[in-house]
Curated annotation (Swiss-Prot):
Disruption phenotype: Shows a slightly altered sensitivity to killing by 4-nitroquinoline-1-oxide and to heat shock; and a 6- to 14-fold reduction of the spontaneous mutation rate of reversion of a HIS4 mutation. Residues 37-60 have a biased composition (Basic and acidic residues). It comes from the Eukaryota. Keywords: Glycoprotein, Phosphoprotein, Repeat, Stress response. Sequence repeats lie at residues 74-81, 82-89, 90-97, 98-105, 106-113, 114-121, 124-131, 132-139, 141-148, 149-156, 157-164, 165-172, 175-182, 183-190, 191-198, 201-208, 209-216, 217-224, 225-232, 233-240, 243-250, 251-258, 260-267, 268-275, 278-285, 287-294, 296-303, 306-313, 314-321, 322-329, 332-339, 340-347, 348-355, 358-365, 366-373, 375-382, 393-400, 407-414. This is Stress protein DDR48. One of its GO terms (biological process) is DNA repair. Residues 74-414 are annotated as: 38 X 8 AA approximate tandem repeats of S-[NS]-N-[ND]-D-S-Y-G. The modification Phosphoserine is found at S183, S191, S314, S322. DNA damage-responsive protein that may be required for maintaining the rate of spontaneous mutagenesis. Shows low ATP and GTP hydrolysis activity. Dispensable for acquisition of thermotolerance and does not play a significant role in recovery or protection of cells from acute heat shock. Residues 12-27, 70-421 have a biased composition (Low complexity). Residues 1-430 are annotated as: Disordered. Induction: Expression is induced by DNA damage, as well as by salt, oxidative, and heat-shock stress.
Protein backbone atom coordinates (compact mmCIF):
# COMPACT_ATOMS: atom_id res chain seq x y z
CA UNK A 1 0.00 0.00 0.00
CA UNK A 2 1.45 3.32 -1.02
CA UNK A 3 1.67 6.49 0.99
CA UNK A 4 -1.33 8.12 -0.65
CA UNK A 5 -3.39 4.97 -0.20
CA UNK A 6 -2.62 5.07 3.49
CA UNK A 7 -3.55 8.74 3.67
CA UNK A 8 -6.86 8.11 1.90
CA UNK A 9 -7.59 5.13 4.12
CA UNK A 10 -6.81 7.24 7.13
CA UNK A 11 -9.01 10.09 5.89
CA UNK A 12 -11.95 8.01 4.71
CA UNK A 13 -12.27 6.16 8.01
CA UNK A 14 -12.46 9.40 9.97
CA UNK A 15 -15.78 10.51 11.38
CA UNK A 16 -14.49 13.91 12.45
CA UNK A 17 -15.79 13.79 15.96
CA UNK A 18 -14.29 13.18 19.32
CA UNK A 19 -16.60 10.50 20.51
CA UNK A 20 -15.66 9.16 23.91
CA UNK A 21 -17.73 6.08 23.24
CA UNK A 22 -15.06 4.80 20.85
CA UNK A 23 -12.13 5.95 23.00
CA UNK A 24 -11.38 8.81 20.64
CA UNK A 25 -10.40 6.37 17.93
CA UNK A 26 -12.47 8.06 15.25
CA UNK A 27 -11.04 11.52 14.57
CA UNK A 28 -7.88 12.61 12.76
CA UNK A 29 -6.16 14.03 15.85
CA UNK A 30 -6.66 10.96 17.97
CA UNK A 31 -5.42 8.77 15.14
CA UNK A 32 -2.39 10.95 14.70
CA UNK A 33 -1.63 10.88 18.41
CA UNK A 34 -1.96 7.12 18.45
CA UNK A 35 0.45 6.85 15.53
CA UNK A 36 3.01 9.12 17.26
CA UNK A 37 2.66 7.39 20.56
CA UNK A 38 1.34 8.52 23.89
CA UNK A 39 4.80 9.17 25.38
CA UNK A 40 5.82 11.60 22.67
CA UNK A 41 2.45 13.35 22.83
CA UNK A 42 2.85 13.88 26.56
CA UNK A 43 6.41 15.15 26.08
CA UNK A 44 5.22 17.65 23.50
CA UNK A 45 2.28 18.68 25.69
CA UNK A 46 4.53 19.33 28.69
CA UNK A 47 6.97 21.22 26.52
CA UNK A 48 4.48 23.77 25.14
CA UNK A 49 2.01 23.72 27.95
CA UNK A 50 -1.28 21.92 28.26
CA UNK A 51 -3.41 24.99 27.46
CA UNK A 52 -1.54 25.76 24.27
CA UNK A 53 -1.64 22.09 23.32
CA UNK A 54 -5.43 21.91 23.82
CA UNK A 55 -5.95 25.07 21.74
CA UNK A 56 -3.76 23.73 18.96
CA UNK A 57 -5.52 20.36 19.08
CA UNK A 58 -8.91 22.09 18.84
CA UNK A 59 -7.85 24.13 15.80
CA UNK A 60 -6.47 21.06 14.07
CA UNK A 61 -9.69 19.16 14.68
CA UNK A 62 -11.72 22.09 13.31
CA UNK A 63 -9.56 22.29 10.21
CA UNK A 64 -9.80 18.58 9.50
CA UNK A 65 -13.58 18.66 9.96
CA UNK A 66 -13.84 20.92 6.89
CA UNK A 67 -11.52 18.82 4.75
CA UNK A 68 -12.28 15.80 2.54
CA UNK A 69 -9.96 13.84 0.33
CA UNK A 70 -12.53 11.23 -0.62
CA UNK A 71 -12.46 10.82 -4.42
CA UNK A 72 -15.32 8.32 -4.64
CA UNK A 73 -17.80 11.02 -5.73
CA UNK A 74 -18.83 10.25 -9.33
CA UNK A 75 -21.57 12.87 -9.58
CA UNK A 76 -19.30 15.69 -10.56
CA UNK A 77 -19.85 17.95 -13.53
CA UNK A 78 -17.90 18.07 -16.73
CA UNK A 79 -16.90 14.46 -16.97
CA UNK A 80 -16.44 12.71 -20.30
CA UNK A 81 -19.72 11.20 -21.39
CA UNK A 82 -21.60 12.30 -18.31
CA UNK A 83 -25.08 13.75 -18.45
CA UNK A 84 -23.83 17.26 -17.99
CA UNK A 85 -23.84 20.11 -20.43
CA UNK A 86 -21.49 20.18 -23.36
CA UNK A 87 -20.03 16.73 -22.90
CA UNK A 88 -19.13 14.50 -25.81
CA UNK A 89 -21.93 12.06 -26.49
CA UNK A 90 -24.02 13.13 -23.55
CA UNK A 91 -27.75 13.67 -23.73
CA UNK A 92 -27.40 17.38 -23.28
CA UNK A 93 -27.71 20.31 -25.59
CA UNK A 94 -25.46 20.67 -28.58
CA UNK A 95 -23.59 17.43 -28.10
CA UNK A 96 -22.54 15.14 -30.91
CA UNK A 97 -24.95 12.27 -31.20
CA UNK A 98 -26.88 13.16 -28.09
CA UNK A 99 -30.65 13.23 -27.89
CA UNK A 100 -30.72 16.95 -27.36
CA UNK A 101 -31.45 19.88 -29.57
CA UNK A 102 -29.51 20.36 -32.75
CA UNK A 103 -27.32 17.33 -32.41
CA UNK A 104 -26.29 15.03 -35.21
CA UNK A 105 -28.38 11.92 -35.13
CA UNK A 106 -30.01 12.71 -31.82
CA UNK A 107 -33.72 12.53 -31.20
CA UNK A 108 -33.98 16.24 -30.73
CA UNK A 109 -35.10 19.06 -32.91
CA UNK A 110 -33.57 19.55 -36.30
CA UNK A 111 -31.11 16.72 -36.08
CA UNK A 112 -30.15 14.46 -38.94
CA UNK A 113 -31.90 11.16 -38.60
CA UNK A 114 -33.20 11.84 -35.13
CA UNK A 115 -36.76 11.34 -34.04
CA UNK A 116 -37.25 14.99 -33.38
CA UNK A 117 -38.88 17.82 -35.22
CA UNK A 118 -37.76 18.36 -38.77
CA UNK A 119 -35.17 15.64 -38.78
CA UNK A 120 -34.29 13.51 -41.74
CA UNK A 121 -35.83 10.16 -41.12
CA UNK A 122 -36.81 10.90 -37.56
CA UNK A 123 -39.74 9.37 -35.76
CA UNK A 124 -41.28 12.21 -33.86
CA UNK A 125 -44.57 13.86 -34.59
CA UNK A 126 -43.75 17.33 -35.76
CA UNK A 127 -42.31 19.06 -38.75
CA UNK A 128 -41.92 16.25 -41.14
CA UNK A 129 -38.88 14.29 -42.06
CA UNK A 130 -38.08 11.96 -44.90
CA UNK A 131 -39.24 8.51 -43.95
CA UNK A 132 -40.10 9.34 -40.38
CA UNK A 133 -43.41 8.63 -38.77
CA UNK A 134 -44.01 12.25 -38.06
CA UNK A 135 -46.24 14.81 -39.61
CA UNK A 136 -45.53 15.51 -43.24
CA UNK A 137 -43.09 12.69 -43.61
CA UNK A 138 -42.57 10.52 -46.63
CA UNK A 139 -43.79 7.04 -45.93
CA UNK A 140 -44.43 7.59 -42.27
CA UNK A 141 -47.33 6.11 -40.37
CA UNK A 142 -48.30 8.92 -38.11
CA UNK A 143 -50.10 12.16 -38.38
CA UNK A 144 -50.78 14.81 -40.95
CA UNK A 145 -49.17 15.03 -44.34
CA UNK A 146 -47.21 11.85 -44.50
CA UNK A 147 -46.73 9.85 -47.64
CA UNK A 148 -48.54 6.60 -47.25
CA UNK A 149 -49.45 7.12 -43.64
CA UNK A 150 -52.85 6.37 -42.25
CA UNK A 151 -53.31 9.90 -41.04
CA UNK A 152 -54.51 13.08 -42.53
CA UNK A 153 -52.87 14.39 -45.63
CA UNK A 154 -51.53 11.11 -46.85
CA UNK A 155 -50.74 10.19 -50.41
CA UNK A 156 -53.54 11.45 -52.60
CA UNK A 157 -55.20 13.56 -49.96
CA UNK A 158 -56.41 17.05 -50.62
CA UNK A 159 -54.38 18.60 -47.89
CA UNK A 160 -51.34 20.73 -48.10
CA UNK A 161 -47.88 19.37 -48.39
CA UNK A 162 -48.72 15.78 -49.14
CA UNK A 163 -47.24 13.71 -51.90
CA UNK A 164 -48.81 15.11 -55.01
CA UNK A 165 -50.81 17.63 -53.07
CA UNK A 166 -52.23 20.78 -54.54
CA UNK A 167 -49.47 22.96 -53.29
CA UNK A 168 -46.76 24.70 -55.19
CA UNK A 169 -44.05 22.41 -56.41
CA UNK A 170 -45.09 19.33 -54.52
CA UNK A 171 -43.42 16.00 -54.98
CA UNK A 172 -43.50 15.21 -58.63
CA UNK A 173 -44.72 18.56 -59.83
CA UNK A 174 -42.49 21.01 -61.64
CA UNK A 175 -44.92 23.74 -62.51
CA UNK A 176 -45.53 27.00 -60.77
CA UNK A 177 -49.17 26.53 -60.05
CA UNK A 178 -50.98 24.54 -57.46
CA UNK A 179 -50.85 20.86 -58.20
CA UNK A 180 -52.43 18.00 -56.37
CA UNK A 181 -53.02 14.36 -56.87
CA UNK A 182 -56.02 14.19 -59.13
CA UNK A 183 -57.21 17.69 -58.38
CA UNK A 184 -58.88 19.92 -60.89
CA UNK A 185 -56.36 22.66 -60.53
CA UNK A 186 -53.79 23.72 -63.01
CA UNK A 187 -50.95 21.30 -63.13
CA UNK A 188 -52.61 18.65 -61.07
CA UNK A 189 -51.20 15.23 -60.58
CA UNK A 190 -51.63 13.58 -63.93
CA UNK A 191 -53.16 16.64 -65.50
CA UNK A 192 -52.40 17.92 -68.98
CA UNK A 193 -50.76 21.10 -67.86
CA UNK A 194 -47.31 22.27 -68.70
CA UNK A 195 -45.43 20.70 -65.86
CA UNK A 196 -47.64 18.28 -64.08
CA UNK A 197 -46.36 15.04 -62.77
CA UNK A 198 -45.95 12.85 -65.81
CA UNK A 199 -48.03 14.93 -68.22
CA UNK A 200 -46.86 16.74 -71.31
CA UNK A 201 -49.78 18.68 -72.75
CA UNK A 202 -50.60 22.28 -72.20
CA UNK A 203 -54.27 22.43 -71.39
CA UNK A 204 -56.12 22.65 -68.16
CA UNK A 205 -57.40 19.38 -66.89
CA UNK A 206 -59.01 18.06 -63.78
CA UNK A 207 -59.46 14.76 -62.11
CA UNK A 208 -62.27 12.96 -63.84
CA UNK A 209 -63.17 15.84 -66.08
CA UNK A 210 -64.36 15.47 -69.66
CA UNK A 211 -61.82 17.88 -71.06
CA UNK A 212 -59.16 17.00 -73.50
CA UNK A 213 -56.69 16.44 -70.80
CA UNK A 214 -58.38 15.13 -67.73
CA UNK A 215 -56.96 12.65 -65.35
CA UNK A 216 -56.75 9.58 -67.51
CA UNK A 217 -58.27 11.48 -70.41
CA UNK A 218 -58.18 10.67 -74.10
CA UNK A 219 -55.46 13.04 -75.08
CA UNK A 220 -51.96 12.05 -75.87
CA UNK A 221 -50.28 13.32 -72.79
CA UNK A 222 -52.31 12.45 -69.78
CA UNK A 223 -51.02 10.98 -66.59
CA UNK A 224 -48.66 8.28 -67.64
CA UNK A 225 -48.17 9.69 -71.13
CA UNK A 226 -49.11 8.01 -74.38
CA UNK A 227 -46.03 5.88 -74.51
CA UNK A 228 -45.96 2.21 -73.90
CA UNK A 229 -45.07 3.05 -70.42
CA UNK A 230 -46.05 3.67 -66.93
CA UNK A 231 -46.70 6.81 -65.11
CA UNK A 232 -44.49 9.41 -66.68
CA UNK A 233 -41.97 7.00 -68.11
CA UNK A 234 -41.25 6.03 -71.67
CA UNK A 235 -40.73 2.45 -70.77
CA UNK A 236 -42.88 -0.56 -70.79
CA UNK A 237 -43.54 -0.67 -67.15
CA UNK A 238 -43.13 1.01 -63.93
CA UNK A 239 -43.86 4.37 -62.57
CA UNK A 240 -41.35 6.78 -63.98
CA UNK A 241 -38.77 4.17 -64.81
CA UNK A 242 -36.66 4.20 -67.94
CA UNK A 243 -35.90 0.58 -68.50
CA UNK A 244 -37.87 -1.74 -70.68
CA UNK A 245 -38.61 -4.37 -68.15
CA UNK A 246 -41.05 -4.54 -65.38
CA UNK A 247 -39.80 -1.93 -63.03
CA UNK A 248 -40.96 0.56 -60.52
CA UNK A 249 -40.81 4.25 -60.07
CA UNK A 250 -37.21 5.26 -60.48
CA UNK A 251 -35.84 1.75 -60.46
CA UNK A 252 -34.93 -0.55 -63.30
CA UNK A 253 -35.95 -3.63 -61.44
CA UNK A 254 -38.98 -5.77 -61.60
CA UNK A 255 -40.28 -4.12 -58.58
CA UNK A 256 -41.90 -1.31 -56.85
CA UNK A 257 -41.72 2.40 -56.76
CA UNK A 258 -38.17 3.32 -55.96
CA UNK A 259 -37.13 -0.11 -54.81
CA UNK A 260 -34.12 -1.95 -56.14
CA UNK A 261 -35.00 -5.52 -55.54
CA UNK A 262 -37.35 -7.89 -57.23
CA UNK A 263 -41.05 -8.27 -56.86
CA UNK A 264 -41.37 -5.38 -54.54
CA UNK A 265 -43.59 -2.52 -53.71
CA UNK A 266 -43.15 1.16 -53.81
CA UNK A 267 -39.92 1.85 -52.04
CA UNK A 268 -39.64 -1.52 -50.39
CA UNK A 269 -37.35 -4.39 -51.17
CA UNK A 270 -39.87 -6.98 -50.25
CA UNK A 271 -42.51 -8.87 -52.06
CA UNK A 272 -45.01 -6.55 -50.66
CA UNK A 273 -46.86 -3.38 -50.84
CA UNK A 274 -46.12 0.13 -51.65
CA UNK A 275 -43.67 1.36 -49.08
CA UNK A 276 -43.71 -1.72 -46.89
CA UNK A 277 -40.61 -3.59 -45.86
CA UNK A 278 -41.84 -7.00 -44.91
CA UNK A 279 -41.77 -10.06 -47.05
CA UNK A 280 -45.40 -10.92 -46.85
CA UNK A 281 -48.30 -9.59 -48.72
CA UNK A 282 -48.74 -6.13 -47.39
CA UNK A 283 -50.17 -2.81 -48.30
CA UNK A 284 -48.97 0.65 -48.98
CA UNK A 285 -46.94 1.56 -45.96
CA UNK A 286 -48.17 -1.33 -43.88
CA UNK A 287 -46.26 -4.32 -42.66
CA UNK A 288 -49.04 -6.84 -42.50
CA UNK A 289 -50.23 -9.44 -44.93
CA UNK A 290 -52.30 -9.26 -48.04
CA UNK A 291 -53.49 -5.82 -47.30
CA UNK A 292 -54.63 -2.68 -48.88
CA UNK A 293 -53.23 0.74 -49.15
CA UNK A 294 -52.21 1.59 -45.63
CA UNK A 295 -54.22 -1.14 -43.97
CA UNK A 296 -52.80 -3.91 -41.85
CA UNK A 297 -55.35 -6.65 -42.22
CA UNK A 298 -55.51 -9.48 -44.69
CA UNK A 299 -56.90 -9.63 -48.18
CA UNK A 300 -58.51 -6.29 -47.94
CA UNK A 301 -59.62 -3.37 -49.93
CA UNK A 302 -58.49 0.14 -49.70
CA UNK A 303 -58.30 0.41 -45.95
CA UNK A 304 -60.97 -2.23 -45.39
CA UNK A 305 -60.56 -5.59 -43.75
CA UNK A 306 -62.95 -7.89 -45.52
CA UNK A 307 -61.88 -10.58 -47.91
CA UNK A 308 -64.52 -10.18 -50.56
CA UNK A 309 -66.17 -7.50 -52.52
CA UNK A 310 -63.22 -5.31 -53.10
CA UNK A 311 -63.25 -1.58 -52.97
CA UNK A 312 -61.91 1.20 -55.11
CA UNK A 313 -59.79 -0.45 -57.70
CA UNK A 314 -60.34 -4.06 -56.76
CA UNK A 315 -58.18 -6.87 -58.02
CA UNK A 316 -60.48 -7.80 -60.77
CA UNK A 317 -59.42 -7.54 -64.31
CA UNK A 318 -60.04 -3.87 -64.09
CA UNK A 319 -58.86 -2.34 -60.88
CA UNK A 320 -57.71 1.19 -60.39
CA UNK A 321 -55.07 1.45 -63.00
CA UNK A 322 -55.76 -2.13 -64.01
CA UNK A 323 -53.77 -4.10 -66.51
CA UNK A 324 -55.57 -2.85 -69.55
CA UNK A 325 -53.90 -1.65 -72.66
CA UNK A 326 -54.44 1.88 -71.60
CA UNK A 327 -54.67 2.26 -67.90
CA UNK A 328 -54.87 5.47 -66.02
CA UNK A 329 -53.25 8.02 -68.21
CA UNK A 330 -52.71 5.51 -71.00
CA UNK A 331 -51.81 6.35 -74.56
CA UNK A 332 -54.51 4.59 -76.49
CA UNK A 333 -56.32 6.43 -79.20
CA UNK A 334 -59.82 6.40 -77.89
CA UNK A 335 -61.47 9.03 -75.84
CA UNK A 336 -61.50 8.18 -72.22
CA UNK A 337 -62.21 9.92 -68.99
CA UNK A 338 -62.38 9.15 -65.34
CA UNK A 339 -64.90 6.38 -65.01
CA UNK A 340 -65.61 6.02 -68.69
CA UNK A 341 -66.03 2.70 -70.44
CA UNK A 342 -63.51 3.36 -73.14
CA UNK A 343 -60.34 1.49 -73.60
CA UNK A 344 -58.54 4.04 -71.56
CA UNK A 345 -60.59 5.10 -68.64
CA UNK A 346 -59.29 5.55 -65.21
CA UNK A 347 -58.97 2.03 -63.97
CA UNK A 348 -60.17 0.33 -67.11
CA UNK A 349 -59.84 -3.38 -67.78
CA UNK A 350 -57.07 -3.16 -70.27
CA UNK A 351 -53.84 -5.02 -70.12
CA UNK A 352 -51.95 -2.69 -67.93
CA UNK A 353 -51.92 -1.06 -64.62
CA UNK A 354 -52.24 2.37 -63.23
CA UNK A 355 -50.20 4.67 -65.37
CA UNK A 356 -48.85 2.06 -67.73
CA UNK A 357 -49.62 1.75 -71.40
CA UNK A 358 -47.60 -1.24 -72.36
CA UNK A 359 -49.06 -4.52 -73.37
CA UNK A 360 -47.83 -6.52 -70.50
CA UNK A 361 -49.52 -6.85 -67.22
CA UNK A 362 -47.97 -4.24 -65.04
CA UNK A 363 -49.12 -2.09 -62.21
CA UNK A 364 -48.11 1.23 -60.88
CA UNK A 365 -44.46 0.57 -60.41
CA UNK A 366 -44.79 -3.18 -60.55
CA UNK A 367 -44.49 -5.86 -63.17
CA UNK A 368 -47.74 -7.53 -62.23
CA UNK A 369 -51.12 -7.67 -63.76
CA UNK A 370 -52.71 -5.11 -61.67
CA UNK A 371 -51.98 -3.27 -58.62
CA UNK A 372 -50.51 0.10 -58.05
CA UNK A 373 -47.02 -0.44 -56.86
CA UNK A 374 -47.33 -4.16 -56.29
CA UNK A 375 -44.94 -6.75 -57.59
CA UNK A 376 -47.07 -9.83 -57.78
CA UNK A 377 -49.95 -10.81 -60.00
CA UNK A 378 -53.40 -9.39 -59.91
CA UNK A 379 -52.65 -7.06 -57.12
CA UNK A 380 -53.85 -3.89 -55.64
CA UNK A 381 -52.21 -0.61 -55.01
CA UNK A 382 -49.22 -1.52 -53.00
CA UNK A 383 -50.18 -5.07 -52.24
CA UNK A 384 -49.00 -8.31 -53.72
CA UNK A 385 -52.38 -9.91 -53.45
CA UNK A 386 -54.67 -10.90 -56.24
CA UNK A 387 -56.37 -7.65 -55.91
CA UNK A 388 -56.81 -4.22 -57.19
CA UNK A 389 -56.11 -0.95 -55.64
CA UNK A 390 -56.52 -1.98 -52.04
CA UNK A 391 -58.92 -4.84 -52.65
CA UNK A 392 -58.28 -8.53 -52.30
CA UNK A 393 -60.90 -10.44 -54.24
CA UNK A 394 -61.33 -11.08 -57.91
CA UNK A 395 -65.01 -10.46 -58.33
CA UNK A 396 -67.56 -7.94 -57.31
CA UNK A 397 -65.56 -4.84 -57.09
CA UNK A 398 -66.11 -1.20 -57.39
CA UNK A 399 -65.28 1.80 -55.40
CA UNK A 400 -65.85 0.38 -51.94
CA UNK A 401 -68.79 -1.71 -53.05
CA UNK A 402 -69.35 -4.80 -55.08
CA UNK A 403 -70.45 -3.04 -58.23
CA UNK A 404 -71.06 0.60 -57.66
CA UNK A 405 -73.88 0.99 -60.08
CA UNK A 406 -72.74 -1.57 -62.59
CA UNK A 407 -74.07 -4.98 -63.46
CA UNK A 408 -71.11 -6.70 -64.97
CA UNK A 409 -68.26 -8.74 -63.61
CA UNK A 410 -64.57 -8.31 -63.17
CA UNK A 411 -64.66 -4.57 -63.24
CA UNK A 412 -63.14 -1.84 -61.25
CA UNK A 413 -64.16 1.58 -60.34
CA UNK A 414 -64.79 3.21 -63.68
CA UNK A 415 -63.50 0.29 -65.64
CA UNK A 416 -64.63 -0.78 -69.06
CA UNK A 417 -64.15 -4.50 -69.07
CA UNK A 418 -64.46 -6.29 -72.32
CA UNK A 419 -67.04 -8.84 -71.45
CA UNK A 420 -69.94 -6.80 -70.28
CA UNK A 421 -71.24 -3.53 -69.03
CA UNK A 422 -69.03 -1.16 -67.20
CA UNK A 423 -69.32 0.50 -63.91
CA UNK A 424 -69.63 4.07 -63.01
CA UNK A 425 -69.59 5.79 -66.31
CA UNK A 426 -71.57 3.62 -68.65
CA UNK A 427 -70.59 1.27 -71.40
CA UNK A 428 -68.44 3.38 -73.65
CA UNK A 429 -67.59 7.02 -73.49
CA UNK A 430 -67.92 9.02 -70.38
Amino acid sequence: MGLFDKVKQFANSNNNNNDSGNNNQGDYVTKAENMIGEDRVNQFKSKIGEDRFDKMESKVRQQFSNTSINDNDSNNNDSYGSNNNDSYGSNNNDSYGSNNNDSYGSNNNDSYGSNNDDSYGSSNKKKSSYGSNNDDSYGSSNNNDSYGSNNNDSYGSNNNDSYGSNNDDSYGSSNKNKSSYGSNNDDSYGSNNDDSYGSSNKKKSSYGSSNNDSYGSNNDDSYGSNNNDSYGSNNDDSYGSSNKKKSSYGSNNDDSYGSSNNNDSYGSNNDDSYGSSNKNKSSYGSSSNDDSYGSSNNDDSYGSSNKKKSSYGSNNDDSYGSNNDDSYGSSNKKKSSYGSSNNDSYGSNNDDSYGSSNKKKSSYGSNNDDSYGSSNNNDSYGSNNDDSYGSSNRNKNSYGSSNYGSSNNDDSYGSSNRGGRNQYGGDDDY
